[in-house]
């Protein structure tokens, strides 16, 4: 018996079936490094249009988590897809290095006794060490970038650039010194940015406090009375008893109605709408004897409950009727609205009472409560109010309250002398900053679109930006202030440039060790050199200045504006926000053209990731068990516009999908064995109809994928590539071509046509997956036939695909109908296999009973219809001849019948044919196989 296996063109490739990604990926990384892949990309991109995705810097502290991995992979997929789209897309990774968390780490490790200089030195060392660890982890994810030369906000050039950015804003008149309430953390001993504030539930003691009237005659007149018959008081409600010692005014709404209520012993002023609820709370009975519009009570004085001073009525529209009494007590040092209202009524900074120190303790000189920590003083204040007869009611409530993101402790608003960027301050030229920023938001593209309204709302309502901090590890605010007037030195901008030059050489230490005389000469004695540092959001918020046109000048043809900023949705109040403000202040426009926001990771049940819940996914562990490409595939498959679910089970599903894509690639490569495109590639017009369709289908899909990539819709890319591999290729085309690929002559047109199609598909597919499966695509690239450069990334989307001619007889619609027929036949073949009627599809002979139009279509394939259906015989009969036992299908106008072939099985192609054994020299094989072995070979036209 002859062994015909050796006569077949069996698939062969060294491309491994088992990916072994955890072991293979580090080897691929080494190869990228050894060939200098990133440098080569910059070289080939010199004459291309530029696309700049500017990296929002992660904080240089700790190991990377799944959110970091998600963010960097998304960025890498964009950079890679833009590169393949013909752009020069540099990617410079960066790190945020200054700020309290690092300073806090150093204090915990080394103690709080350190000098400021030593603190900065240790902070710099710590940040550098953290960056190296994170860098290794980011590279392991397959992220292509300038890792040898990243930007760091602590690099001397960047620190100097930040000072220059501040100088620009000073020059344009945006920066001012002011006493304003800012978010203050006692543990940090510093002001906090809006982005450093989080909200959590807090138990607070609420109090209703009566302030006795001082201007009794005015109060009577306001209510239309000739005199007050009894003592009178106005009642406030607050959740912050500790602010009562700093009370300086009372706020009511000008448009609300206020009532004078007789409660027997005294008269109370309350909002008319709240009289009933207040009396019930105070366990009092009373009647309204008069009402007045809020505006009528303006500037009437009341007395502080336990200090000898007056509290006038100021009108304020922020007062609400949702809770309390309709009267708000005002401590301008400890509330934003309080401060604004008191300033509007002419209160000067020097008159604002600030009894709470930076550590949360009242100054010693404060009567009754000096030296007490404010939270602990609350009961004493309540007791004092009760003692003087001012306490109407007290209870404890739980409410959402602002906390420090780092220490998780409650914050307060605290008025301190700080440096601000004014939102509504008129600059030297152009519109105020708020106006510029709101206009810039309208000019920016947002993905998803809802981000625009969110950022607009934040900018429209935000206060002035407090940019100063009282910390050691930060870029200095290099100002000299006149000791007499407190004003900036008249040559401030010029002096800042001198400081920047020194910082460029020595880092921020240059400012802190600078002798003022060195810059000011004889004037030095007249000025104070300040020690405040900049908010870290100013560090990262000015990277468009000190990175994109500084340390890593991108040379963008349309200026230093980045094409894209991409971060998590929390950055609407963080990096997107601070960058927008500095960009609009310095340049008059946003530093980005487009903002892309991704959601946060949650587990499969939608719960937030947390170590206490045990539901965290560590990217390092995924790399070591499944491989980074699996993590990348998960990122691509998930719609990032909302929360992104990830778990071990979800990643396992990604691994299953990966195997299907890898197996498809392996099938393609193994069937290109012996194929040399320079020698064997057929022109489109010489290819078989099915092969031309496969290439055309690939071209159509490539057009869709290019559009999805350009819109950053990676989940669409993933689903369409996966479906293409599983359905159009695996479920249709690749199954059909096996017979032709294996059994026809090695150099026959039938086989070379098929290999030409497989080659085109492979060249396209390897590029499609390159932005997502970065490692696997480059691995496939090494196994593809023909001469090629060192990496798939050194190319653009494949241009060798051809379209079906417009007049093709077997057009796209034709093959869609054939696919539907094949699906119907497959369904019945499966039924027959399950019923044990046939052992395999090739043991079947199928008769198709078709309506006239479908009959004509199917007959176009002639005898090759059986190869498409992968049966040993296929015939088409008019629909009306269908017997009663013919199976009705989902295809309109089609019934079919499958029977087991009564013929012998060919020992070479495994088809069951009547002519098996008809050739005496080859008694075990069919006539077609004999012709393929010894004759001119079978001729195929279609499939």
UniProtKB/Swiss-Prot annotation:
GO MF annotations for this entry? aminoacyl-tRNA deacylase activity; ATP binding; isoleucine-tRNA ligase activity; tRNA binding; zinc ion binding
Sequence motif: 'KMSKS' region, positions: 608-612
BP terms from Gene Ontology: isoleucyl-tRNA aminoacylation
Binding locations of Zn(2+): 906, 909, 926, 929
Indicate the family of this protein: Belongs to the class-I aminoacyl-tRNA synthetase family. IleS type 1 subfamily.
Q: Which residues bind ATP?
A: 611
Name the residue ranges of motif: 'HIGH' region.
Answer: 58-68
- According to its UniProt record, where is this protein located? Cytoplasm
The Gene Ontology CC terms held by the record are: cytosol
Q: Where does L-isoleucyl-5'-AMP bind?
A: 567
Arranged from A to Z, the UniProt key words for this protein are: Aminoacyl-tRNA synthetase, ATP-binding, Cytoplasm, Ligase, Metal-binding, Nucleotide-binding, Protein biosynthesis, Zinc
Assembly description: Monomer.
- State the organism named in the record: Pseudomonas entomophila (strain L48)
EC number(s) of the enzyme?
6.1.1.5
Q: Which reaction does it catalyse?
A: tRNA(Ile) + L-isoleucine + ATP = L-isoleucyl-tRNA(Ile) + AMP + diphosphate
> How are cofactors bound according to the entry's free-text note?
Binds 1 zinc ion per subunit.
Cofactor(s) required, per the database record: Zn(2+)
For this protein, the record's PROSITE patterns field holds:
AA_TRNA_LIGASE_I (PS00178)
Q: What is this protein called?
A: Isoleucine--tRNA ligase
Q: InterPro entries annotated for this entry?
A: aa-tRNA-synth_I_CS (IPR001412), aa-tRNA-synth_Ia (IPR002300), Anticodon_Ile_BEm (IPR033708), Ile-tRNA-ligase (IPR002301), Ile-tRNA-ligase_type1 (IPR023585), Ile-tRNA_ligase (IPR050081), M/V/L/I-tRNA-synth_anticd-bd (IPR013155), Rossmann-like_a/b/a_fold (IPR014729)
Q: What is known of its domains?
A: IleRS has two distinct active sites: one for aminoacylation and one for editing. The misactivated valine is translocated from the active site to the editing site, which sterically excludes the correctly activated isoleucine. The single editing site contains two valyl binding pockets, one specific for each substrate (Val-AMP or Val-tRNA(Ile)).
């Amino acid at each position: 018996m002859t062994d015909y296996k050796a006569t077949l063109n069996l698939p062969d490739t060294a491309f491994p079936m088992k990916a072994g990604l955890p072991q293979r990926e580090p080897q691929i990384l080494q190869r990228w490094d050894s060939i200098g892949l990133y440098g080569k990309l910059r070289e080939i991109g010199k004459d291309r249009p530029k696309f700049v995705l500017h990296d929002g810097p992660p904080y240089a502290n700790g190991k990377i988590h799944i959110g970091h991995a998600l963010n960097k992979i998304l960025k890498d997929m964009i950079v890679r897809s833009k590169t393949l789209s013909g752009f020069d897309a540099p990617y410079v990774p960066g790190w945020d290095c200054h700020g309290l968390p690092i300073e806090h780490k150093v204090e915990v490790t080394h103690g709080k006794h350190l000098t400021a200089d030593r603190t900065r030195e240790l902070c710099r060392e710590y940040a550098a060490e953290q960056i190296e660890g994170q860098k290794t982890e980011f590279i392991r994810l397959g992220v292509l970038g300038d890792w040898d030369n990243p930007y760091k906000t602590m690099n001397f050039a960047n620190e100097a650039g930040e000072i220059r950015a501040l100088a620009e804003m000073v020059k344009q008149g945006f920066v001012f010194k002011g006493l304003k309430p800012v978010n203050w953390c006692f543990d940090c001993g510093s002001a906090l940015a809006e982005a450093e504030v989080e909200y959590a539930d807090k138990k607070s003691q609420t109090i209703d406090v009566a302030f006795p009237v001082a201007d009794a005659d005015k109060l009577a007149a306001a209510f239309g009375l000739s005199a007050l018959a009894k003592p009178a008081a106005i009642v406030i409600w607050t959740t912050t008893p500790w602010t009562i010692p700093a009370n300086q005014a009372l706020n009511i709404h000008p448009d609300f109605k206020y009532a004078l209520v007789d409660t027997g012993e005294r008269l109370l002023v309350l909002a008319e709408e709240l009289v009933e609820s207040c009396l019930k709370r105070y366990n009092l009975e009373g009647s309204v004897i008069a009402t007045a519009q809020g505006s009528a009570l303006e500037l009437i004085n009341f007395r502080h409950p336990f200090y000898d001073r007056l509290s006038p009525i100021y009108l304020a529209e922020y007062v609400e009727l949702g809770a309390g009494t309709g009267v708000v007590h005002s401590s301008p040092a400890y509330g934003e609205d309080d401060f604004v209202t008191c300033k509007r009524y002419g209160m000067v900074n020097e008159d604002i009472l600030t009894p709470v120190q930076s550590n949360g303790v009242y100054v010693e000189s404060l009567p009754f409560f000096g030296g007490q920590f404010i939270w602990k003083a609350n009961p004493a204040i309540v007791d004092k109010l009760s003692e003087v007869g001012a306490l109407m009611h007290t209870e404890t409530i739980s409410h959402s309250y602002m906390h420090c993101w780092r220490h998780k402790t409650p914050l307060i608003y605290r008025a301190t002398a700080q440096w601000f960027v004014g939102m509504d301050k008129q600059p030297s030229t152009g519109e105020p900053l708020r106006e510029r920023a709101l206009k810039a938001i309208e000019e920016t593209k947002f993905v998803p679109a809802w981000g625009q309204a969110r950022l607009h709302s934040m900018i429209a309502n935000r206060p002035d930006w407090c940019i100063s901090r009282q910390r050691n590890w930060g870029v200095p605010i290099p100002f000299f202030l006149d000791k007499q007037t407190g004003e900036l030195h008249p040559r401030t901008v010029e002096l800042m440039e001198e400081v920047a030059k020194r910082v460029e050489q020595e880092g921020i230490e240059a400012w802190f060790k600078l002798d003022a005389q060195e810059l000011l000469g004889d004037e030095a004695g007249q000025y104070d050199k300040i020690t405040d540092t900049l908010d870290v959001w100013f560090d990262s918020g000015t990277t468009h200045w000190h990175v994109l046109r500084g340390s890593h000048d991108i040379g963008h043809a349309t200026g230093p504006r980045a094409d894209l900023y991409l971060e998590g949705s929390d950055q609407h109040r963080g990096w997107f926000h601070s960058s927008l403000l500095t960009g609009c202040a310095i340049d008059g426009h946003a530093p980005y053209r487009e903002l892309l926001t991704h959601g946060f990771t949650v587990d499969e049940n939608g719960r937030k990731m947390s170590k206490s819940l045990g539901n965290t996914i560590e990217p390092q562990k995924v790399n070591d068990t499944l491989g980074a490409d699996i993590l990348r595939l998960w990122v691509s498959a998930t719609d990032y516009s909302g929360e992104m679910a990830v778990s071990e089970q979800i990643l396992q599903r990604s691994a299953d999908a990966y195997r299907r894509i890898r197996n498809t690639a392996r099938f393609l490569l193994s069937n290109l064995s012996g194929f040399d495109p320079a020698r064997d590639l057929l022109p489109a017009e010489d290819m078989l109809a099915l092969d031309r369709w496969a290439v055309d289908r690939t071209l159509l899909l490539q057009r869709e994928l290019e559009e999805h990539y350009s819109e950053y819709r990676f989940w669409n890319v993933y689903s369409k590539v996966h479906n293409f591999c599983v359905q159009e290729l695996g479920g249709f085309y690749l199954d059909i071509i096996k017979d032709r690929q294996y059994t026809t002559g090695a150099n026959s047109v039938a086989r070379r046509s098929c290999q030409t199609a497989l080659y085109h598909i492979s060249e396209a597919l390897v590029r499609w997956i390159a932005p997502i499966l970065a490692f696997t695509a480059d691995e496939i690239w090494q196994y593809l036939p023909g001469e090629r450069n060192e990496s798939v990334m050194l190319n653009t989307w494949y241009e060798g695909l051809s379209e079906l001619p417009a007049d093709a007889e077997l057009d796209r619609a034709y093959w869609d109908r054939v696919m539907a027929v094949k699906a119907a036949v497959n369904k019945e073949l499966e039924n027959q296999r399950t019923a044990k009627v046939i052992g395999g599809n090739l043991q079947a002979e199928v008769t198709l009973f078709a309506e006239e139009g479908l009959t004509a279509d199917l007959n176009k394939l002639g005898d090759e219809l059986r190869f498409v259906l992968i049966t040993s015989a296929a015939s088409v009969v008019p629909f009306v001849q269908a017997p009663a036992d013919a199976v009705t299908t989902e295809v309109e106008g089609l019934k079919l019948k499958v029977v087991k072939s009564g013929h012998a099985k060919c020992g070479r192609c495994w088809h069951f044919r009547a002519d098996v054994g008809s050739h005496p020299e080859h008694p075990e094989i069919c006539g077609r196989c004999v012709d393929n072995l010894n004759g001119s070979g079978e001729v195929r036209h279609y499939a």
